[in-house]
Amino acid sequence: MMPVLKRMLLHTVNKPWGKYEDLYRTDEVVLKKITVDPKQRLSLQAHNHRAEFWVVTDGECLCEVGPNVWRLRKWGTIHIERGHAHRLINDTSEPCEITEFQFGLCQEDDITRYEDDYSRAEPPF
């Protein structure tokens, strides 16, 4: 029983755009609560080994996936296939909360950043 409890411990990571909290984590499934601060956005990024599913649980945000941008409000959802460039954008004056489900090979270093407001993007080749 102890290994399951360890996987379910809440872990908070502060980011320049807000924070995320690990709610559940295994090698193949991750459940996160993401809070995007007002007027902030995540990097434009892609993952080679995992897909993601987002549910807006509070506020609203823009979701950019490839060339498309959608406004999602509370309980709005979107699925991001592995390999697709994507990002969350909070263009409002209130925080936006997202529940993120990751599935596949879930590792934090499985990320390619194409654009980033905080100078974390990969240099062009």
Question: Residues of each region from the PLM?
Answer:
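A short glycine-rich, His/Asp/Glu-containing loop-to-beta-strand
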Residues: L9-A51
